[in-house]
């Protein structure tokens, strides 16, 4: 039969045997692959069997739609954490398992694993790549390790010290705007709107040494960043839109590409200008001129960075890291600070104690300005910030997909290739980690109370090798802005309680509104 089937090609019986052999080899290879997949699925099932799972909606949907990015979804997550305090297994449809870990003792193995073992889940982070390139947030492997080492000096306290002046100035601009709005009779303000512009204003000055005056007038670059952030958050909730081919055809996809072009052109123009400046001045003269102003911006540090072999970052790498810092630095800090203001508005006794601490620190000082050394002199204000970051973490979850099996401290195993969610919100709201977790209590972070706690019980900036490289920058900015705000204004809760909305960062549906009253001159 095989001879006849080949005769029309002009091939005789003598070539039939090799074809039979090839067909047999091909069939054997396919069968082997199927058996390997079956064995892997069986092996994974055995490991996954050790993780409890809530009842599925049905066999087809699995647990899809149980924990939604809404206030109700966070309440459901809180219920699940109370029921399964170590973590639980959920299914996306009938075939895709996702493990959620929500206890500080359990997440240690994942967070402390090397960046090469515990990779970020590429499915989500890939949608950021057209905007952020291979910056620290998106990259992996050797490239990530090299960039992390080269960027670490950018966040040394000697670099950060002069930024405190910028934080003061940007906060002053925001407060001047508040005073005008209040004098016009409007004292009800959306904290997210105002604080986001303030953090973008600071970042643009710290990253590019560029003042767009974005808090007072519109800026194409700032508008593009805000639009990109909104589009990414929207796309994150639409799994079908993860396919680039489909997304690029939609109106949102077209707006995304247009906004990317605006951001990239701005960053590229700054880099080109710095390259022109460096040859004209020479490196020594350039550093001397910067020393006079006492400020090296982020672009300067990236341009001057060299790895162990003396190689510099490419312009493409510099753009990716600058764009990443603008993205990561504004939304997370704005979320953190907005919720801090909200929590202090709801707890006037803590607000007043923070205010007195700031007043005592700045007594007799003109102008009223926070300096770098002051940041360590605000212990109660720092406790209030940390407790707010626990109760309302800006980033509620991080995802990992491990390249090898991960053994957990309790003996269970997370199989290679399984998506693992580390629920920062879940850990922070876990009653077996934090007693009465829904209560805002800054004294949890009193040095005497916190000393025996697990270092992984509080991870608003993640932890381990891939922790947030800019956490000192963020904490410094929040301290400055909060201290000056409490010095000048009284914060009061709005009549309507906000509904939390976990997107890329923790927001509030329709904004986070507070009432703001200026303090009399004699009050501070």
UniProtKB/Swiss-Prot annotation:
Signal peptide: none annotated. One of its GO terms (molecular function) is heme binding. Keywords: Endoplasmic reticulum, Heme, Iron, Membrane, Metal-binding, Microsome, Monooxygenase, Oxidoreductase. Heme binds at residues 328, 468. Pfam families: p450. It is an enzyme of class 1 (oxidoreductase). Its cofactor is heme. Gene3D superfamilies: Cytochrome P450 (1.10.630.10). Pathway: Lipid metabolism; leukotriene B4 degradation. One of its GO terms (cellular component) is endoplasmic reticulum membrane. It catalyses: leukotriene B4 + reduced [NADPH--hemoprotein reductase] + O2 = 20-hydroxy-leukotriene B4 + oxidized [NADPH--hemoprotein reductase] + H2O + H(+). Its EC number is 1.14.14.94. It is found in: Endoplasmic reticulum membrane; Microsome membrane. The keyword Transferase does not apply. PROSITE patterns: CYTOCHROME_P450. InterPro entries: Cyt_P450, Cyt_P450_CS, Cyt_P450_E_grp-I, Cyt_P450_sf, Cytochrome_P450_Monoox. Belongs to the cytochrome P450 family. Cytochromes P450 are a group of heme-thiolate monooxygenases. Catalyzes the omega-hydroxylation of LTB4. This is Leukotriene-B4 omega-hydroxylase 3. It comes from Mus musculus (Mouse).
């Amino acid at each position: 039969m095989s001879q006849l089937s080949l005769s029309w090609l002009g091939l005789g019986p003598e070539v039939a045997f090799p074809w039979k052999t090839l067909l047999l080899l091909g069939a054997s290879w396919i069968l082997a692959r199927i058996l390997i997949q079956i064995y892997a699925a069986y092996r994974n099932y055995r490991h996954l069997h050790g993780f409890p799972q809530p009842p599925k909606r049905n066999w087809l949907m699995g647990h899809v739609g149980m924990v939604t990015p809404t206030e109700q979804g966070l309440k459901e997550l809180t219920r699940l954490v109370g029921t399964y305090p170590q973590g639980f297994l959920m299914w996306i449809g009938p075939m895709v398992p996702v493990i959620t870990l929500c206890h500080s003792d359990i997440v240690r193995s994942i967070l402390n694993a090397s960046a090469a073992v515990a990779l970020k889940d590429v499915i989500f982070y890939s949608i950021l790549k057209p905007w952020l390139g291979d910056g620290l947030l998106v990259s992996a492997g050797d490239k990530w390790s090299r960039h992390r080492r080269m960027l670490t000096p950018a966040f040394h306290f000697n670099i950060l010290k002069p930024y405190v002046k910028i934080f003061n100035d940007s906060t002053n601009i925001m407060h001047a705007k508040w005073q005008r709005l209040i004098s016009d009779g409007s004292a009800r303000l959306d904290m997210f709107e105002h604080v986001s512009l303030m953090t973008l204003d600071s970042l643009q000055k710290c990253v590019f040494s560029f003042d767009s005056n974005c808090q007072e007038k519109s800026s194409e670059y700032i508008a593009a960043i805000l639009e990109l952030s909104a589009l990414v958050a929207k796309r994150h909730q639409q799994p079908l839109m993860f396919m680039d081919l489909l997304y690029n055809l939609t109106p949102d996809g077209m707006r995304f590409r247009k906004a990317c072009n605006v951001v990239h052109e701005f960053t590229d123009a700054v880099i080109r200008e710095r390259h022109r400046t460096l040859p004209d001045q020479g490196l020594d003269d350039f550093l001397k001129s910067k020393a006079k102003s006492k400020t090296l911006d982020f672009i300067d540090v990236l341009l001057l960075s060299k790895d162990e072999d003396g190689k510099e970052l490419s312009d493409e790498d510099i753009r990716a890291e600058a764009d990443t810092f603008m993205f990561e630095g504004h939304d997370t800090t704005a979320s953190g600070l907005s919720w801090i203001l909200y929590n202090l508005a709801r707890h006037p006794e803590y607000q007043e104690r923070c205010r007195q601490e700031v007043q005592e620190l700045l007594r007799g000082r003109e102008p009223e300005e926070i300096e770098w050394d002051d940041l360590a002199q605000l212990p109660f204000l720092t406790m209030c910030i940390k407790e707010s970051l626990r109760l309302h973490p800006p980033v509620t979850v991080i995802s990992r997909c491990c390249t090898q099996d991960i053994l957990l401290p309790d003996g269970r195993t997370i199989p290679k290739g399984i998506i693992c969610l580390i629920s920062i919100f879940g850990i922070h709201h876990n009653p077996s980690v934090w007693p009465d977790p829904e209560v805002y209590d800054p004294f949890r972070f009193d040095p005497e109370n916190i000393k025996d706690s697990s270092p992984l019980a509080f991870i608003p900036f993640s932890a381990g090798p891939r922790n947030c490289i800019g956490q000192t920058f963020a904490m410094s900015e929040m301290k400055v802005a909060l201290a000056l705000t409490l010095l000048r204004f009284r914060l009061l809760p709005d009549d309507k309680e906000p509904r939390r909305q976990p997107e890329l960062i923790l927001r509030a549906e329709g904004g986070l509104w507070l009432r703001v009253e200026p303090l009399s001159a004699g009050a501070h």
